[in-house]
């Protein structure tokens, strides 16, 4: 009987901790001879209860600080939360755990001595301690306000649980950028085609945007946008403005009767005049103008007006056509040619006695091939014997000899004998 009863109580004590009260009541009804065994069982119950509570506290340790204060009464919560608020801020950072435990042990009030075993075990579990997310962090901060009562904390806790976390911003290499780049490239190509079709230059677009929308852009900026040479950020800023201008420019000529605001000038006022398109004249009209040009190449203003009325053309177009046709006629009839040098003739050599004779001119040595000889007669001027030589008898040496012969008639025969005669004459012998 004595041996079976302790076995029965041990089986009941190894179960759930909640059965400890039943074990105590049954143990009180045991005989007086088993008092010593009852004391041992009571100690075993207390140790098992303490072990279970320690396991529960260790398993729920990350949420211990944020959930523990909510179970306190409303009067005691304000003071306890004020002291736990710096504790929460310090425990959230894993790098300061060893210093935090010593600091908290020195400043913990008497009512919170139960937290000391948990704080002492923090340095051994640094690897398992994680930073809380946005929701629990906001919850603990809302609980830590000293001025709030227990009833007023509930809406703050509910609101903090529904707060959205930080949105993920796509990086520069995300999936959205290629789509935007394709759209920008397509818009730039379409914008250029529609701008040329409307007859506006890049400078006109920049000037119009400055007057219409207050953002003045240069011709270079519009050109770089069409060539996709701007940065992605600048092109994204410029696209809506250009798109708005393009829509206004296309809707303006199609609906001229539409009323525009007084603060917005019309496109004709902005641009002054569009780029004039190339004039195309039909074949029959061109033949008529050619016939009129053959009759009168330079008509007057009245005649130009009459021709323009007959052909249903603008007067300025007819005037410009006649001006261009005259310039074309000058290019056809007066080609540019190199000027021809006039021939150089030798002076006549006349003897003082009046007798007509021919004087032989010594040959002139030159670097050009061929020699030129000329004969002087009263009725014939000296000309080059060969047409391809291009060298006349008016070289400096020949002219000097001719001048000497004309000035000194007595020495004409001497000079006409040539250099060979002078060097072989007895007077030159030394």
UniProtKB/Swiss-Prot annotation:
SUPFAM superfamilies: Homeodomain-like, lambda repressor-like DNA-binding domains. Expressed in epidermis and hair follicles. Residues 23-32, 67-78, 392-413 have a biased composition (Polar residues). It is found in: Nucleus. It comes from the Eukaryota. GO terms for cellular component: cytosol; nuclear body; nucleolus; nucleus; plasma membrane; transcription regulator complex. GO terms for molecular function: DNA binding; DNA-binding transcription activator activity, RNA polymerase II-specific; DNA-binding transcription factor activity, RNA polymerase II-specific; identical protein binding; RNA polymerase II cis-regulatory region sequence-specific DNA binding; sequence-specific DNA binding; sequence-specific double-stranded DNA binding. Residues 274-333 bind DNA. Residues 1-40, 60-81, 129-180, 248-267, 355-413 are annotated as: Disordered. Disulfide bonds: none annotated. SMART domains: HOX, POU. Residues 176-250 form the POU-specific domain. Pfam families: Homeodomain, Pou. Residues 129-139, 251-267, 355-364, 374-390 have a biased composition (Low complexity). Keywords: Activator, DNA-binding, Homeobox, Nucleus, Transcription, Transcription regulation. Its main location: nucleus. Interacts (via the POU domain) with POU2AF1 and POU2AF2 in a DNA-dependent manner; this interaction recruits POU2AF2 to chromatin and increases POU2F3 transactivation activity. Belongs to the POU transcription factor family. Class-2 subfamily. This is POU domain, class 2, transcription factor 3.
